[in-house]
């Protein structure tokens, strides 16, 4: 072991299986390609090693081998439908009517409220072209009451385009 390796705890992290140097990390979400860049988002709590107030971490790659860490893409927003966490979801580049030239990066995820943590709403986050900023959020569907299941079983699962 070199002195540099000893001083950098991330030097032994796997290179092809993404891990994070800090906090709780969970399943990948919103994996998609925008232009020549792959975007992988993942459930992450950067403040603790506990599964709590989940953010969406973000890494990018041109070749799916070498990865670059980006700032968190989605974070819980106080007083909003995702104030207790940003859970599972999907990602895509919207090229439909009204989208920006080249498409609008869009993430759709389950948001959980502090006041009702057992209920999840479908939230749409739209971003800028390089996906470094998601700043337009819309609650697309409030927590549904699915007969026989209740609103606590809802999760955003799949989107398709025509």
Identify the residue ranges that each predicted region occupies.
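Beta-rich carbohydrate-recognition and catalytic domains
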Residues: 1-162
């Amino acid at each position: 072991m070199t002195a540099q390796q000893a001083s950098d705890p991330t030097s032994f992290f796997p290179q092809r299986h993404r891990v994070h140097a800090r906090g709780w990390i969970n399943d990948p979400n919103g994996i998609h390609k925008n232009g020549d860049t792959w975007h992988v988002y993942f459930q992450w709590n950067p403040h603790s090693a506990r599964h709590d107030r989940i953010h969406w971490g973000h890494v990018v790659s041109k070749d799916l081998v070498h990865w670059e860490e980006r700032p968190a893409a989605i974070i819980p927003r106080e007083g909003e439908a995702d104030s207790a966490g940003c859970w599972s979801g999907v990602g895509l580049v919207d090229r439909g009517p009204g989208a920006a030239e080249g498409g609008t990066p869009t993430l759709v995820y389950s948001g959980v409220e502090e006041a009702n943590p057992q209920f999840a709403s479908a939230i749409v986050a739209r971003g800028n072209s390089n996906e470094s900023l998601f700043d337009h959020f819309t609650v697309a569907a409030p927590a549904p009451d699915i007969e026989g299941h209740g609103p606590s079983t809802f999760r955003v699962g799949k989107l398709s385009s025509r």
